[in-house]
Amino acid sequence: MWHYTSINNDTRVALDPKPNQIRTITKPNTVPQLGTDYLYTFNPQRRSHTLRLLGPFQYFNFSETDRGHPLFRLPLKYPSKTIPTDELVDNLHSWMRSVHLLHTRSDDNSLRYNWMLGVYARSTNYTTPVGQLVVKTPAILNYANPQDAFNSVFIALGIDYIDIPITNSNIFDDGSTPYNVRIWHAPTMTEVNHILTLMRKSTLVSTHSSWHWNVLHTFHYRSESDMIDHFSAKILEDWRQKEKFDKGALVEADRVIQRLIPLSSSTYVQRLAAIGALYPNEFTENVLDLSRLSTALLQLSDTYYQHANDQLKRLYRRMYNDSRTLYMTARHQELLLAQVAANPNILLYPYTHIFTTAHITASYISNTGQGRIKHSLAVTGTTEHSTVPDIILGPTSEDVITISMVEPMSIAAEDMYGYVIDTPTRDIWPADEQVEQKGDAVALYDTKTSRALGMFNNTVRIDDLLSPLLGRVYRTYAKGDTMAMTQGSLDHQTLCAAVDSDITFVGNRMIAPLAEGYVPRAMHRNNSTMKMLSLYVAIKKLENFAANSYLMSPDTSIILLGAEREPAVNILRRFNSSVSNVRIIGMGDRAVEPNIRVRVPFPIDKNISADFVICDINSYEDQSFESMFGETMSVVTTCASAATRSLVKINHPSEYMINSVIERLSKLGGVFYHTALLKTASQNTYSYETYIYITPIAAAVGFLFYNNSAIINRYMTAVADDEAPVIPSIHTIIKEHSNTYSPGLFCGCIDVQSAPLALSQLKSYCSEATTWRVDSDDNLVNIIARIDPARIALEFRTRSNTSAHHEYQRCVPNGLGFKIRKTREFRYMHREVTFIHKLMMYALIREQISLTESMTQVVSIGGRNLADISVVPLTMKYIVIDPAARIETLTQEKKNIEIQARAFQFDASTMDLENNSIYLFIAVIMNEPNGAATPAQTQIDKIRNVATAMLTRTNCVAYISFYESGIITRLSQSTAHKTIRVEDGRLKVANYVPVDTLPEADVTLMLRDIGITYEIIRPSTPELVNACSSYGIRLGSTGGAVLDVFNHYSPVIKLVRS
């Protein structure tokens, strides 16, 4: 059985902007961003450029004037190489700003602008009847009801349809458009039936099973090949949609069936329509060659035409001969009926037939292989050789390897609701600092912030990361089995977020089984829903940290501000349905029923108050700093005055902004407030937005301010990037010795006999490689290897022409793996926050060391696996002191590395520090070599002894990391993160034993007394971008909440002796 999250989401309507947004879209102040506004690729083999626009511009009709813009001449300027990013972005930005669309602004926020008609009218230079009408009455492009988006034009012009050419998705391809979409004036099914019958007499026409805007449209093709390509693409989209839902993925879909229906076509299209309706087993078994989609589908249709299974053969032939009928399963029908129930006025393709797929169960492909083989690649080979030619990997088809953007991740329900807080510690806010902080805040606001953070956030949204978990919860419930959970628990709330139906409890710990035959709806969510639910959990925990029930108390209320159509309101109502007299209210300046439309500050004649307020109102970006500042102050004071406990979003949490909020609260008239900054695990992981928690307290205490806050630091260091972030690449050429590779993967296939040499050559860039064959009779082997910056740093210490070819020769032919089923690989892999923090520290130290002169060596204490080699300049000797360190003698000789397999002596009298040296003590002083925890005083003694010994040396630098005591307070009041937590007053990180933390004040006082030069340094946003970009990794979904606190309270001491 397969289930949908939502079939009522018209994605095309959602892309239509508000009339007042047109100028912002066509006159963007910021330059276009890769992945957000456009996608660009260059194929060196074909010498072809592909530029695809995203957002509203993906549906754009270009005029002859547009084609004359320098943007469209760039492929001619760079016929055989990639267009420089700066030149591409500058020209794209220039072209966007040259676009002028006729429109009429409106303060009615329920209106949308018909982008399709607007850009079509412009592309004709307003010479068509539609264009002339738009010139005369531009307001006709505004609509409230989607079905009225075109009706007003039809009525005004007295026409039956509008033909609009569909532009190639690659805007650099200026060839003729493959087809026109014809928008019909057919408001009722009577007209729809008449038009569909009429189109059967036309040539090369198709249509959908349902229509965007609820307006009938048909596709009219210029050639049979264009129709075949369009049909094939939509079949693949439909099959993939069904496959996702078969697996329980909760994704939004704008129609139940994506396949097209041929109204007048050819025998080729009839064959495609028939095979598309069958949902054949060959697709789920991944045996189709998707690189030749149309050909593969037609070949598959021939197989079913003469299939050995008589039922399948008859069903295929029936579908072929009756291709104008939309064949669907009983589940399809059920979903369509649900659409009709939700919207009785919906228009649907009327000629349908229900068939069963129960007999399509034969599995014709079995996986009998041994699986893929992962090879650990040697650092240095044993065979000397001269130069080796580049190795070129051949392309792999999509049915063998699929490359997706981000690795899926697993997360527990309770982790979704984790949060971290940071409390103020300073009792004054000096006037001179106020002036300085305001200057910093204004400068950062005006220059905007990191494009890389925006790209990482947009690579995959938080709801995409959390949907697999919610999908599993939904499937468990939909099976109808009895489920045990406590009413009011996090599991209960998660079930409410997954299922759009009432949950019935038997007693307090058991959910009643579903009635036989009842299929519950899956809950529709947006990207903010789980964040709002986690904020609800946070505000309940802040009310009573020890509580395990998250139900509201009787006779209490909560307001969710900024709710336009926020599903969290209904989810919380169902979650709290067992509690008497609970009010859960959604409010926003664009809210629709059942939420309440209201602006902040609240009207003076409205007595709006609640026990809790969660405010998710965004600050508009296209306003001055002062306007944004005033708007934020107004929202904060409104929420603080309206509720006992508030959580308020701060889009620009500069130190000046947060301290100004606290100062404003101090002037509200005799009320004393406790404040704290909060981040949740269900926010976008790279977001710097934060929430301020506000609650009045009875005691007349002074207001505390922030100084060097962990959470604020994310925003303050998110400065604008000089360059766009690098998306991990797919490399197909393995050079013998090159330091020009960007982060990413080597991926491709090669003949079996060449595989050993390919593996040997990959050792220069990768620490592991995976191989497998898909056909024992084939001579090809597939290879995947992820670039490892640490391996590159090791390889390029000295150039050594050594090969491990003969070592890998033993793998041929049967040691290379065998796997038939499709393999998925990912450009970005998820990593825990502790791993990313370590990489951030390395990036920070590497930058510091790069500025150091006249040093001869870097000495790593405890660097047993050479993990910190990436910070060592190629010209310096690398020494590792660790009793567990092991590395081949050959590698030491070739790479200028020295291994001392012993424990480092921290006694000041015997410490053997050398001049002209850099020492690394990363994650070392808090544990002994055997893993036991080191007491706090012993840790301080170790730091003291290193500093004291350095005073007797010259030109010596040390980097020492430690855990600062402030993290205990922060994590003790927080619920995230499992891999970093407090146990009995000590800090437990990952699988290590809990250790003592050190007060920073005690450490710095001791260093001042010794008289050594020191600096406390901390990794921040630039290092986060560096680590994730260099290694092709992403924070796990809960890492964004705790990363800032862990970075801040895991600093590095830099000791310097000149």
Swiss-Prot record:
Catalyzed reactions: a 5'-end diphospho-ribonucleoside in mRNA + GTP + H(+) = a 5'-end (5'-triphosphoguanosine)-ribonucleoside in mRNA + diphosphate; a 5'-end (5'-triphosphoguanosine)-ribonucleoside in mRNA + S-adenosyl-L-methionine = a 5'-end (N(7)-methyl 5'-triphosphoguanosine)-ribonucleoside in mRNA + S-adenosyl-L-homocysteine
Q: Which GO terms describe its molecular function?
A: ATP binding; GTP binding; mRNA 5'-cap (guanine-N7-)-methyltransferase activity; mRNA guanylyltransferase activity
Is Nucleotide-binding included in the keywords of this UniProt record? yes
Q: What class of enzyme is it?
A: transferase
Entry EC no(s): 2.7.7.50, 2.1.1.56
Localization in the cell: Virion
An example GO CC term for this entry is: viral outer capsid
Identify the keywords attached in UniProt to this record, alphabetized: ATP-binding, Capsid protein, GTP-binding, Methyltransferase, mRNA capping, mRNA processing, Multifunctional enzyme, Nucleotide-binding, Nucleotidyltransferase, Outer capsid protein, S-adenosyl-L-methionine, Transferase, Virion
> Per UniProt, what is one Pfam family of this protein?
Reov_VP3_MTase1
Q: Which family does it belong to?
A: Belongs to the orthoreovirus lambda-2 protein family.
Q: What does this protein do?
A: Outer capsid protein involved in mRNA capping. Catalyzes the last 3 enzymatic activities for formation of the 5' cap structure on the viral plus-strand transcripts, namely the RNA guanylyltransferase, RNA-7N- and RNA-2'O-methyltransferase activities.
This protein's name: Outer capsid protein VP4
Taxonomically, what lineage is the organism? Viruses, Riboviria, Orthornavirae, Duplornaviricota, Resentoviricetes
Q: Gene symbol?
A: S4
